[in-house]
Amino acid sequence: MIGRIRGLLIEKQAPEVLVDVSGVGYEIQMPLTSFYELPELGQEAVIYTHFVVREDAQLLYGFISKQERSLFRLLIKANGVGPKLGLTILSGMTAREFVACVERDDIATLVKLPGVGKKTAERLLVEMRDKLKSLMEASVGSEREFMLQSNYTAPEAVNTAEEDAIAALLSLGYKPAQASKAVSSVYTDGMSSETLIKSALKSML
């Protein structure tokens, strides 16, 4: 089990990052809420991970805090929720916001996320209510750990912020027309990819 990775952040293309640890590059998929908290390229980061072994692949999912990872682990234990949908849920809202949805029985917000229909949302609210009791306090005071050391200069990004944002939304399950419309509606000159992704997601919730 790989539970934590500490290394140099050498690639960032939402929702995936590449971290160099002693010459070995680890590809890690992250929810966008954690992705936003990452340091710049060339700096060192600590990422808490969940390791999944499948017949055709070995996958690492990464989180900025232990509490967010704990919530992800609870989510994928829910009926009908796999790692991909778990990442989508935590990309559309923070751990704290998800806890608030469960507390309020807020189906309307959950069904706005791609891949979450009414039945899935109802099932999530029922199954997660008891599981979250021990997690709620921890998620409010989540620790965020970064180790920033390096003078590495990152190469210039090839893709535009709009292209990056649309690609990130497509990876979360949004349709091309939805992604393009959301990005276009919030884009202003000078926006970074991360700010644009965050704004586009908020516009759809």
Curated annotation (Swiss-Prot):
GO molecular function: ATP binding; four-way junction DNA binding; four-way junction helicase activity
Localization of this protein: Cytoplasm
Source organism superkingdom: Bacteria
Span list, region Flexible linker: 144-156
Entry GO terms, CC: cytoplasm; Holliday junction helicase complex; Holliday junction resolvase complex
Gene3D superfamilies documented for this protein: 5' to 3' exonuclease, C-terminal subdomain, DNA helicase RuvA subunit, C-terminal domain, Nucleic acid-binding proteins
Positions of the UniProt region annotated as Domain II: 65-143
Positions of region (Domain I): 1-64
Region annotation Domain III: where it falls in the sequence: 157-205
Gene Ontology biological-process entries: DNA recombination; DNA repair
Disulfide bond positions: none
Keyword tags: Cytoplasm, DNA damage, DNA recombination, DNA repair, DNA-binding
Domain notes per entry: Has three domains with a flexible linker between the domains II and III and assumes an 'L' shape. Domain III is highly mobile and contacts RuvB.
Membership in a protein family: Belongs to the RuvA family.
Assembly and binders: Homotetramer. Forms an RuvA(8)-RuvB(12)-Holliday junction (HJ) complex. HJ DNA is sandwiched between 2 RuvA tetramers; dsDNA enters through RuvA and exits via RuvB. An RuvB hexamer assembles on each DNA strand where it exits the tetramer. Each RuvB hexamer is contacted by two RuvA subunits (via domain III) on 2 adjacent RuvB subunits; this complex drives branch migration. In the full resolvosome a probable DNA-RuvA(4)-RuvB(12)-RuvC(2) complex forms which resolves the HJ.
Function: The RuvA-RuvB-RuvC complex processes Holliday junction (HJ) DNA during genetic recombination and DNA repair, while the RuvA-RuvB complex plays an important role in the rescue of blocked DNA replication forks via replication fork reversal (RFR). RuvA specifically binds to HJ cruciform DNA, conferring on it an open structure. The RuvB hexamer acts as an ATP-dependent pump, pulling dsDNA into and through the RuvAB complex. HJ branch migration allows RuvC to scan DNA until it finds its consensus sequence, where it cleaves and resolves the cruciform DNA.
Protein name: Holliday junction branch migration complex subunit RuvA
Record organism: Shewanella halifaxensis (strain HAW-EB4)
The organism's taxonomic lineage, starting at the top: Bacteria, Pseudomonadati, Pseudomonadota, Gammaproteobacteria, Alteromonadales
Gene: ruvA
